[in-house]
Amino acid sequence: MEANSRVMVRVLLLALVVQVTLSQHWSYGWLPGGKRSVGELEATIRMMGTGEVVSLPEEASAQTQERLRPYNVINDDSSHFDRKKRSPNK
């Protein structure tokens, strides 16, 4: 009896997994077959505008200048290596 119930639970679980994996995942604006409706695509293109470039306002603050200044990643000062004491090899 217990073996029959285990088999039944496994069959039901398999059926649920198959149903979920094969089902259509719907998203807003999508039609069956993965196609968008033409009306919504046209509305999206109209929202994007004419394709003009948007200019950013000029910032002349010190914070902006600091952010744009290149950083020196490699430190040319190797004096910290000279400070290490080397033990003589015996």
Swiss-Prot record:
Entry's localization field: Secreted
The entry's keywords: Amidation, Cleavage on pair of basic residues, Hormone, Pyrrolidone carboxylic acid, Secreted, Signal
An MF annotation (GO) of this entry: gonadotropin hormone-releasing hormone activity
Signal peptide: 1-23
Positions of disulphide bridges: none
Matches recorded under PROSITE patterns: GNRH
Xref: Pfam families: GnRH
GO cellular component: extracellular space
InterPro entries: GnRH, Gonadoliberin
Major localization class: secreted
Modified residues (Glycine amide): 33
Region (Disordered): 56-90
Modified residues (Pyrrolidone carboxylic acid): 24
Superkingdom, natural source: Eukaryota
Stated family: Belongs to the GnRH family.
General function of this protein: Stimulates the secretion of gonadotropins.
Name of this chain's protein: Progonadoliberin-3
Species in which this protein is naturally found: Dicentrarchus labrax
Lineage: Eukaryota, Metazoa, Chordata, Craniata, Vertebrata
